[in-house]
Structures are given as structure tokens and as C-alpha cells.
Amino acid sequence: MTAIWAEENKLAIWLRIEVLACEGRHKILGEIPAKDLIVIRRRAGFSMARCRQIEKRTNHDVIAFLENVAERVGKTPARHIHQGLTSSDLLDTTLAVQMRQSAEILVRDIE
């Protein structure tokens, strides 16, 4: 249960949401070129240490995370990440995922 609410899991969920949003914008809306999506899928990642370092400057955890992901993905593909989303979209969805992960543990323990 502790791992679900750990900072690293939260950011891993953020990353999954961002990549899934890009995949949807490519597949459904045709807004992201295939070559950029391939780069995003291959290179998207984050470093906890780097996110903390950026957050000291920005005072915003989501912006720090997005800057770190952009560093890894590269300028052109990075312009697609988080486009059309808000910080609340990311935070609220992540909270729902963490609650679901926690509920699965609780239900399993009850059974």
C-alpha cells in the first residue's frame, strides 16, 4: 500500500497518463505524427532527482515533471506532451488510479 502512495509511483502514473493522452491524440484525432509518437513511447521517462531539482526552481511539481520528460524526449516530440491537458487532469486521474490500486489491495485482503 505504501508503494502506491509513494512519489515515484505518482510520477509513473503521470507518465502513463501523458503517453496514453498522446496515443489517443494520434490515433483518434490524428494530431500527433507517428514519428513523434514513436519517440515519445521510446524515450519518455523521468528522474526523481531531476524532477526535484527542477521543482526547486519552478515551485510546481507538474511543471518540473513535464520539463524533465521533455528533456528526455527532445524538443519536437515534447511539444505534444500535456497538450490539451491541465495539471488538474493529471492530478485527478492519478488520484483515481491510486485509489483503485489501493481498493484492489483492500478487496484482496478481505477475500
Each language-model region and where it sits:
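A helix-coil-helix interface module used to build multimeric assemblies
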Residues: 1-111
